[in-house]
């Protein structure tokens, strides 16, 4: 099949220049909007808890001045001190601390609920949006990179929401309340403290600037590594067949080393921040202690021993939030890098659908008029609303026509040229040609995985752009080139073709596809669990289940994309008999490597480099001795 994506060999993908987070403020606002949309009352309660906890800590520090000046110092001057007032004072301090602890505990418990709920909502939105994305998005993005958004990037938000943002808010409230408290105790010592804080902030800014860019690169490198691992897991058989284990390992090591380097640089800068700030905080504490002691001894500004003790406690409480702000800044930067990837995926344009013609169950009334019904009658009709408010119903026949169709996966490169063909109800149309001729591309246009650039495709005379995509695809039974089975029972995988199908209908579909025989030989029959994309089945058995899945949908049009290319000759004969019964009365578009499977086609279309070069029945094309004759006889050297 012609593809619009870049074809690359199995190996590491080298990145370009180091990425930067665009509009971090806008990203943070978008995250918080998501939180507030569902958890605003919880966030208000968290804020109350943070304020109570911060004020409790400040009040406890201020109480030290009263404790020293009014209780402890006077008691040292008494021969027979009374400890009862001191005990009462200590009890009050203890109550203050308990209130602070309870508030901090409440804050943590509520934030766990808010964080996990927000992440659940984000994952749901991501998956919902992913389901609406066009096929070309998945053709152009490595699946491992998409998985990394769900896992690594979402997890970075968990740390930011549960720890970083609450600590930043707590630190901000603590800094403000402690600052005013320090000013009340001693403006001179406050100036000394602020000078040291300015130095801490300067150092933190420099460190954050260096670590931030490496945290962003770390997230990108992690996504690349995940994508490579998934690619190698899916292609493990190919790797082993061509004995490329060492090449695969070399590619992994390169990406793994790339991740190690960016993670080392990011965490090296981040890890030195705490020790640097801690040492600067200790210096600030020591300088304030010396200055405070000198002021207390000289009596400057009415400074007492209690003032110095309380101020030193506040000094510690002031430096710690400053250090936390610096450390959490790195976590937030890393989370914003993940958020950028999350919202980039969520902002991808959904698959557009301007269709208004729908597919409905129908029946004939007493006047022999086609009318809509809720019952499954086996008769389908196109429901066509008109501008004048009227609605007409047209029986679904299964006629598909291509008229002057041009298409390219990218606008500047056309891969299908001037395609004209038709499939009448009940006809079997076969596409043959060399690899890359455009056979599968045509089937992708029928189900509108991609839209044409020029020309028209009509379904029962209706332009398929007027038909809603879901209804269009519901009328098509498709057996894809790569058979995909889901984790679940055999019965559930067959029922995937029509979710309301009964067990009896699923079994009948399996019999029609000649899959019933091997299914009954499975350990649990139709209740046998399939895992790992049906890894416990042979390729032929998986193909048979895919055909049964299409059969249970009972569609008027079938698309069989190389459905029997991976099945042995004996199994192919079984499938072919089942498919002949399934295709009877249905318009069928078939692609097959084995031309013997399409000899009975009503029309064989020969494609070469995106153009139709021959068409006709098997006998007609053999008589022409053209391209089809060469393909059928293997005489490709002729002409």
Predicted region positions:
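Hydrophobic alpha-helical transmembrane bundles that constitute the permease/transmembrane domains
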Residues: 51-59, 94-105, 157-160, 164-176, ...
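Juxtamembrane helix-loop junctions of ABC transporter transmembrane domains
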Residues: 17-25, 48-49, 56-72, 96-143, ...
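Membrane-integrated ABC transporters
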Residues: 1-57, 72-93, 107-111, 115, ...
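Short intracellular "coupling" helices and adjacent cytoplasmic loop segments at the cytosolic face
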Residues: 12-19, 116, 124-148, 152-154, ...
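Transmembrane helices of ABC transporter permease
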Residues: 38, 42-55, 96, 102, ...
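An intracellular "coupling" helix at the cytosolic face of ABC transporter transmembrane type-1 domains
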Residues: 37-40, 135-136, 154-161, 165, ...
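ABC-type nucleotide-binding domain
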Residues: 79, 362-639
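Helix-loop-helix
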Residues: 74, 181-195, 265, 269-340, ...
